[in-house]
UniProtKB/Swiss-Prot annotation:
GO molecular function: rRNA binding; structural constituent of ribosome
GO annotation, biological process: translation
Lineage, broadest ranks: Bacteria, Bacillati, Bacillota, Bacilli, Lactobacillales
Region (Disordered): 1-44
Gene Ontology CC annotations of this record: cytosolic large ribosomal subunit
Organism encoding this protein: Leuconostoc mesenteroides subsp. mesenteroides (strain ATCC 8293 / DSM 20343 / BCRC 11652 / CCM 1803 / JCM 6124 / NCDO 523 / NBRC 100496 / NCIMB 8023 / NCTC 12954 / NRRL B-1118 / 37Y)
Family under the similarity heading: Belongs to the universal ribosomal protein uL15 family.
Stretches with biased composition (Gly residues): 23-35
Protein name, per record: Large ribosomal subunit protein uL15
Keyword Ion transport applies: no
Amino acid sequence: MNLNELQPAAGSRHVRNRVGRGTSSGNGKTSGRGQKGQKARGKVRLGFEGGQMPLYRRIPKRGFTNISRKEFAVVNLNKLNSFDDGTEITPTLLIENGIVKNQKSGIKILAVGQLEKKLTVKAHKFSAAAVAAIEQAGGSTEVL
């Protein structure tokens, strides 16, 4: 076998079908759209069901968007094990170390995983289990 004898696997390469380029191509004139009618002309808008009341309008409206909603960046306890014993952990320190990318409305510490270090953690929110786990490890918490 030589380089000039290499061939692609059968069926792996497709030729783009150019429609509307003469009747002998098999897809000339009407370009595979059939005869006249709405679908033979322009595009139909997304969600259009041929004049039938569309699904997104048949289903009732629900809920609202709370404009004062606060979204917190979540940090799990097992991520805090990368710090040394006795470190004071602040939101700026978490951002500098790449644990948090976007602070959003603040930082919330959750009790996912085990904490093996004695740390002072300063954050905007804590789960009750996270506070218990930090204090059990000999550390302390402070709400900002």
